[in-house]
């Protein structure tokens, strides 16, 4: 095990230095409490990061999409991340990942965690940001604007992996969980930030691939925040085959009675898949949901277990 400590009591004082030192895997990096102001990238399989505790072990940075680059261009969404992992069999426990750039209206997108690979696990982690907090790669098949995908996986194969988020706290405003991966969220809190708009937040914006069985599945999660009543949306489709299923989730009064938004893509009514089962809270108003939102039977909900979605 490698130990990171800001006070010099470990093997390294920087998380990235510890990662770079790894010559054989599997390897575990223990990170003592501290504020680690750095960007961290992981490209090696079979690495585990363990923080001392989620409130005290913080990896933070403040890059953002509107940030000017030396060549006169903007940094863009996919080069704004604080933490980047493109690997398989990765685990993170008890860590806060933060992008502190601020509200999207001022800085644009600002990713805290950019996660791509298969068998990625985040447990008891905090992911703090505003617009586009958590990106669950891969990217969509095609960009809509030239240069829109500039970043570390722009030319990587588009292979959706399996990701697990358990007992995590994820905050943001616009589309703060987005991407094409197969993700299972268990006992997580999604916290929407008020930006004083008619619609303050879209919790999720999946870009699930056509023909992919699963997209985002949330089990026993809470959708909360500090927004006025009926001013948040559970999801909207970044791409038209988006899939989101909520199982026994608690939906606060902040959630709009319609719950889901089509992003002005009426064709998505026939192609996306939004569904709920046995949810609770003032934001769960099934009779007001759009016709394209499904209310599952117990048998149908049985297709969305952790084992079936994540694989174990």
Residue positions per predicted region:
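Sequence-level preference for short, compositionally simple segments enriched
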Residues: 1-312
């Amino acid at each position: 095990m490698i130990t990171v400590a800001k006070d010099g009591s470990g093997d390294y004082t920087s998380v990235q230095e510890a990662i770079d030192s790894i010559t054989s895997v599997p390897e575990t990096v223990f990170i003592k409490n501290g504020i680690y102001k750095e960007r961290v990238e992981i490209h090696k399989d079979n690495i585990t990061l363990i923080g001392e505790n989620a409130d005290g072990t913080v990896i933070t940075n403040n890059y953002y999409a509107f940030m000017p680059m030396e060549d006169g261009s903007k940094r863009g969404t996919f080069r704004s991340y604080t933490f980047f992992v493109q690997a398989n069999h990765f685990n993170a426990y008890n860590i806060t990942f933060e992008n502190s750039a601020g509200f999207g209206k001022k800085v644009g997108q600002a990713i805290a965690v950019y996660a791509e690979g298969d068998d990625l696990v985040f447990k008891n982690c905090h992911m703090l940001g505003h617009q586009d907090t958590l990106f669950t790669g891969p990217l969509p098949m095609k960009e809509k604007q030239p240069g829109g995908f500039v970043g570390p996986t722009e030319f990587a194969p588009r292979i959706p992996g399996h990701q697990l988020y358990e007992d995590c706290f994820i905050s943001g405003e616009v589309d703060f969980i987005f991407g094409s991966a197969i993700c299972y969220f268990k006992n997580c809190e999604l916290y929407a930030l008020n930006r004083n708009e008619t619609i303050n937040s879209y919790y999720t914006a999946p870009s699930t691939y056509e023909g992919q069985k699963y997209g985002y599945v949330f089990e026993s999660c809470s959708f909360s925040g500090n927004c006025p009543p009926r001013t948040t949306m559970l999801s909207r489709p970044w791409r038209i085959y988006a899939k989101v299923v909520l199982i026994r989730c608690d939906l606060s009064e902040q959630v709009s009675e319609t719950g889901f938004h089509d992003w002005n893509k009426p064709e998505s009514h026939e192609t996306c898949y939004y569904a709920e089962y046995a949810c609770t809270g003032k934001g769960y108003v099934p009779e007001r949901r759009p016709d394209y939102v499904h209310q599952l039977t117990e048998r149908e909900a049985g297709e969305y277990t952790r084992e079936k979605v994540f694989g174990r």
